[in-house]
């Protein structure tokens, strides 16, 4: 089993410039799912994706001329593994001095290597330079929780802050906060994110929800794990009929990770780069 502390995170790394898929470091999802009460072998109470954007993607064509592109990768939430982000960056850097016949050949290589590491088929798209001008930006839609003037001193995840008024009629709401901050599981470096919560059910107390999201501020966990913890805590404490949680984290090392989890059929969220990304 690959443990996070054995990954390249927090260690001096040699930056190889020739293709080397062995640098990818998979980490099983199950250990962290055990912590939130999701037993191995049981059906997951959600489905979804981890959406990665690759902003520092470069290789050489067969004439030795550098090529640049943006990449997107979609990893299914039911894959047994995630890929540790620094190892992903180091892997992508190995293309910098590697000759590749075409962007299609590059896409196929990345698809093969990441699918092997994640233990499930992933989707890979290469956005060529000619399409850069068509890339859009946007913010998460929804009612801002950050408008609330809350007072708090709780900075570790506290599900007890969450509650819904089960005596009220069900509502359908989309709530957003830009105050999500957690820390890397291994290095403790800050991870900054925006989160969108879409639900149908008894009205969730918005002040309690905002305090709960703020409570991740000193919590050490990877992005994907934080989003699954948020999903499960809201589901258990507030019991919505439908729930979807989508977070967009700021980039590090040329990568950003945007996990999405839902328990109802809905289109995957738009991959719109936020202002902070």
Swiss-Prot record:
It comes from the Bacteria. The keyword Cytoplasm applies. GO terms for biological process: queuosine biosynthetic process; tRNA modification. Its main location: cytoplasm. It is an enzyme of class 1 (oxidoreductase). The keyword Calcium does not apply. It catalyses: 7-aminomethyl-7-carbaguanine + 2 NADP(+) = 7-cyano-7-deazaguanine + 2 NADPH + 3 H(+). Pathway: tRNA modification; tRNA-queuosine biosynthesis. It is found in: Cytoplasm. Pfam families: QueF (PF14489), QueF_N (PF14819). One of its GO terms (cellular component) is cytoplasm. InterPro entries: GTP-CH-I_C/QueF, NADPH_dep_7-cyano-7-deazaG_red, QueF, QueF_N, QueF_type2. Coiled coil: none annotated. Catalyzes the NADPH-dependent reduction of 7-cyano-7-deazaguanine (preQ0) to 7-aminomethyl-7-deazaguanine (preQ1). NCBIfam families: QueF. Homodimer. Belongs to the GTP cyclohydrolase I family. QueF type 2 subfamily. This is NADPH-dependent 7-cyano-7-deazaguanine reductase. It comes from Ralstonia nicotianae (strain ATCC BAA-1114 / GMI1000).
